Structures are given as structure tokens and as C-alpha cells.
């Protein structure tokens, strides 16, 4: 049985799919842990090539021997809601002004996408979490 590697750190980043490069925020975050930055950038870009244009969160586990593994997450719920609503950003005062409306079907579709990353037992609970995110952005769910 192989011995377990000892974890030296955990790094969480949100990077455009297929566009990781050594510039900030990627370079400094990985550099302080001694990780080969170009190796990560090439692996991340290859893994996210088919999702270009989206922000993909990544969780990088760095080991003491300076090797690493990474796990891709689903795009942020806020970004998916903005895409579904067709707007660039939410409002400054979300509970006073509402910008746009999305349907429950769109919310359920986003919930199905995000289900793996949400702390929800079923799609209805996940949809309620997404609806709460929408409300906090000034998006009405109907």
C-alpha cells in the first residue's frame, strides 16, 4: 500500500476556463507554496478547454513534496443566474430595486448544475438556495 502524502496547503481560486496563466492571482498563490506554476496552468487549461468563457472555481491541494492535485467545481451560482437573466451584473440595493426576472424552471436548471457543490439533499432544496442567491442580487424568481 502506498504511503499517504502529507498535505502542505489548500488553495481555492476562481479562474476563467482555459485561461490560467502565471500572472496574478494564479502565480503568487501557487508560488508561495512552491508549486510548478506552468504545470498547473497547462493542466487546468486542458481540463477546462470545453468550458471557455465561464469562471471555474478550482481547489488545489499542495503536498509537502511540492506536487499537487486539483478539483474543479461548478461555476458560481451568481454567474449562472446573471447568464440566465441576460444581465451583466446585479443591483447595488437588491432588496429595494429589482432588475430582472427568472423563472423557476431556470432556477431548477441552475440547481441541477450546482447540485454537486451545494449542501442540499434534493433539487427542491437546491433550487431554494439558488433562489436566495437570486434575491440577494436583485433578481425576482417567478
From Swiss-Prot:
Coiled coil: none annotated. One of its GO terms (molecular function) is large ribosomal subunit rRNA binding. Gene3D superfamilies: Ribosomal protein L11, C-terminal domain, Ribosomal protein L11/L12, N-terminal domain. GO terms for biological process: translation. CDD domains: Ribosomal_L11 (cd00349). One of its GO terms (cellular component) is cytosolic large ribosomal subunit. Pfam families: Ribosomal_L11, Ribosomal_L11_N. Signal peptide: none annotated. One or more lysine residues are methylated. Keywords: Methylation, Ribonucleoprotein, Ribosomal protein, RNA-binding, rRNA-binding. SUPFAM superfamilies: Ribosomal L11/L12e N-terminal domain, Ribosomal protein L11, C-terminal domain. Part of the ribosomal stalk of the 50S ribosomal subunit. Interacts with L10 and the large rRNA to form the base of the stalk. L10 forms an elongated spine to which L12 dimers bind in a sequential fashion forming a multimeric L10(L12)X complex. Forms part of the ribosomal stalk which helps the ribosome interact with GTP-bound translation factors. Belongs to the universal ribosomal protein uL11 family. This is Large ribosomal subunit protein uL11.
Amino acid at each position: 500500500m502506498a504511503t499517504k502524502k502529507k498535505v502542505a496547503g489548500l488553495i481555492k481560486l476562481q479562474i476563467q476556463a482555459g485561461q490560467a496563466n502565471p500572472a496574478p492571482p494564479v502565480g503568487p498563490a501557487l508560488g508561495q507554496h512552491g508549486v510548478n506554476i506552468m504545470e498547473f496552468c497547462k493542466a487546468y487549461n486542458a481540463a477546462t478547454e470545453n468550458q471557455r468563457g465561464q469562471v471555474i472555481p478550482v481547489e488545489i491541494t499542495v503536498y509537502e513534496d511540492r506536487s499537487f492535485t486539483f478539483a474543479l467545481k461548478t461555476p458560481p451560482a451568481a454567474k449562472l443566474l446573471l447568464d440566465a437573466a441576460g444581465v451583466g451584473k446585479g443591483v447595488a440595493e437588491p432588496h429595494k430595486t429589482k432588475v430582472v426576472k427568472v423563472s423557476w424552471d431556470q432556477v431548477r436548471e441552475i440547481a441541477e448544475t450546482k447540485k454537486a457543490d451545494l449542501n442540499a439533499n434534493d433539487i427542491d432544496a437546491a433550487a431554494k438556495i439558488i433562489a436566495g442567491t437570486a434575491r440577494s442580487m436583485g433578481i425576482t424568481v417567478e
